A protein has these predicted regions:
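Eukaryotic chromatin- and chromosome-associated nuclear factors
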Residues: 1-339
Length: 339
């Protein structure tokens, strides 16, 4: 699920990724070498057209906050509203210009509510083993999941709640320090509760980095550190270089609400969403905490019910897109809801 530029910014679900040429199809290419087919969020009865976008026209869902719903929809869920009745009522107006405007407004409200609902759900794929006793309950282990707007695989870095003793750490702008888990296990118990396990790292500056630092364990974390340290002057570097300090071992665990979403490279994210601020940061040789430019999953789902575990991604998306849209997943992904 992403924001995409379409006169104004709108929310949609990528349902197919198409290479621009045959060479791209046979290689690991950057995002700008693909077209992205997107189903606009709203409701199926609105029959919103699908669109095709390039990577430069999209932003991660968690980079923008979802605007509040109009008063008429406050306190209601996407699934509880009779969207067909609302569409029928608006089409009874004899002024077609008013009808078009009213349906556009209704579609916008539906998209906001649908986005929060999808954000507050998850669905798992690629089961790895049979149920096993673990901490007193049976659990299944998985290779990945759709976590709200995002796809997360094992070994991906995910922003998480720091341990209590480090949770008050903040940068000079008042933003919380960034804690990241390298996800080694994705677990769902018999009550469909979700858990992540893996080592947790905190982004800090210190004189020396140990071999257990996060940049030695993950290429994305290494790139974050490399760019930040490249901004340091020789004098600044003497007082400490950036590193991912290990806070917790691979046995560390976070429940669903303590996982905030994927970790995004600060410089690439900032360059995409605010090029002017990116240039200013490079010139000043200072880069804010990654939390400055991306929300948590909990923040973007505020006000909507927690839908929890869904059978598969298409079920989670439900009636929020036009009928007939199928999600084209890589062959490597096998969802729990498949028969």
């Amino acid at each position: 699920m992403v924001w995409f530029k379409h006169a104004a910014w709108r929310i949609g679900v990528i349902y197919e990724i198409v290479p621009k040429n045959q060479q791209t199809a046979n290689s690991e290419a950057d995002d700008d070498q693909y077209y992205f087919r997107i189903a606009q969020l709203g409701h199926a009865v609105l029959n919103l057209p699908n669109v095709v976008k390039e990577s430069g026209d999209m932003r991660p869902f968690l980079t923008f906050s979802v605007p509040a719903s109009q008063n008429d929809f406050t306190g209601q869920s996407f699934a509880s509203i009779n969207w067909q009745n609302l569409v029928t009522q608006r089409r009874q107006n004899s002024d077609q210009a008013t009808v078009r405007l009213d349906l556009q407004t209704l579609g916008l409200e539906a998209s906001k509510m649908a986005a929060r609902a999808i954000n507050n759900s998850f669905s798992v794929f690629n089961r790895l083993d049979d149920p096993q006793p673990d901490l007193g309950y049976n659990v299944h282990s998985y290779g990945g999941l759709f976590f709200g707007a995002e796809l997360i695989n094992l070994n991906d870095p995910v922003r998480v709640k720091p341990p209590n003793y480090a949770d008050s750490s903040r940068d000079s702008d008042g933003k919380k320090k960034t804690a990241v888990m390298l996800v080694k296990r994705i677990l769902v118990d018999a009550s469909n509760r979700l858990f992540f396990r893996g080592p947790v790292y905190l982004l800090i500056r210190q004189p020396l980095a140990t071999q257990t630092a996060g940049e030695h364990q993950d290429t994305l974390l290494a790139e974050e550190i490399s760019f930040r340290n490249s901004l340091l002057s020789e004098t600044d570097a003497q007082s400490g270089r950036w590193t991912w300090f290990q806070l917790e071992s691979a046995a560390a665990e976070r429940v669903e609400k303590e996982a905030y979403g994927r970790f995004y490279l600060s410089h690439k994210l900032l360059k995409a969403i605010n090029p002017a601020e990116y240039q200013q940061s490079v010139a000043a040789r200072q880069l804010k905490e990654p939390t400055a430019w991306v929300n948590s999953r909990v923040e973007n789902g505020a006000g909507a019910a927690d839908l929890g575990c869904q059978r598969n991604r298409r079920v989670a998306i439900g009636a929020s897109v036009v009928e007939g849209v199928g999600i084209q997943l890589p062959e490597s992904i096998r969802e729990e809801g498949e028969t």
